Amino acid sequence: MSSSQTQHDEIDLKHNRPKAGEIRRFATGESVFLSPLPVPTGQPPIDLGGSFLEVNDVYLDVGSSNQGKSYQARLCVMMPMFMIIVCLIVAPVLAGFGTFFNPFGRTFWYYFSDFFVFGLWCSLWTGGAAALIGIYAVVSTTRAKARTRPIRFNRQRREVCYFPDGSDKPVIQPWEDTVAWVSVSTGFTGVGVMSTYTFGMAIDDPVGDKVHFLRQGVPTPLHGLAKWEAIRTYMEKGPDFCPGQATHEGSHTFDKEREDMREEYQHKERSILGVGWWYLSHVVTWWRFPYWVAAWDQRYSMKSMPDSIADWSKPLPPEQWATQSPALKQQSADLEKAFAQGQDFMTYFKANLSEAKAEESQNA
């Protein structure tokens, strides 16, 4: 999730604190709030993008895993390799076919060697440039992730801990005061109206007089509800009822993908051409190398939490566990009753993020 400290008009936490079910409109869209008072959403809990980094009886860490890093590394290897293959093999071979159309009796190898020398220099420049772009993409994204620590949700204390970028000083606030929302923004693309959906959280820092905003793009509002429901389910019910810890990528990922490919071939779900393409594509992208890059990303970016919250993260005796507020219990019971009667979160609060703002944008 991306973070920001900018105060936005649609989420005025200082002068007009929102509550669950409230809808606020802004210039290009609207937001429906899921908390304060984190009530049930009625959606199945889903961990979008593998963000549950640690799940245990005391706390949940939500951040960015290295899922997708091996694919990014493969793309970054494929770009220079594509340039090299085109310049050193494809172009000289095509030039060599010119022997069939020339009246001077020049051989295939005459044209091939002539273009090969040119392709060698071309591949050095284009392949080198593509390699530099790929290295920058891989390293910069890993370094950016390493600067951001995960958000820690302590279910026994019913508190949330957030570390601003570059700081070892925690910002801790009560769980029931955490602001969460799903928003839609609409705009014109020249041929129609396009909507983008965002799941967000806000952590209030009264000591620093700041509000830290955290955002993640989601495919639909229901995905945002499901992401929040996964966090809420952990805090209210425990680790046995929410998604488990996200898996990380490494050499074992390559082994599993190869084993899956072989099983697909054995069960007639993949052709011999598909098997050949799998091996060819992985040879071109340097076999296990992208998965070693993913393992490096995991080691470099997944730093341990500072000692400043070591005591805060220790388990408490059950008699010291914080409990739900009466207001949350009542509102949760009301929502559960509405769900049993066939309503969902959006209809209960009369929120429709996908239609209202689209009509307003078209009228504008």
Model-derived segments and their meaning:
Residues S2-E54:
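Short, non-transmembrane cytosolic segments of multipass membrane proteins
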Residues L53-Y71, Y197-F199:
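Short, hydrophobic/proline-enriched secondary-structure or compact coil segments at domain edges
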Residues V55-V62, C242-R270:
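Juxtamembrane amphipathic/hinge helix adjacent to a transmembrane helix
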Residues S65-R147, E264-A364:
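Alpha-helical transmembrane spans
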Residues S140-D168:
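N-terminal topogenic membrane-targeting module
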Residues P150, D168-I172, G208-F213:
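Short, mixed charged/polar active-site loops
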Residues E159-V160, D168-F188:
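Phosphoinositide-dependent membrane-docking surfaces
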Residues V179-H252:
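A membrane-cytosol interface segment of integral membrane proteins
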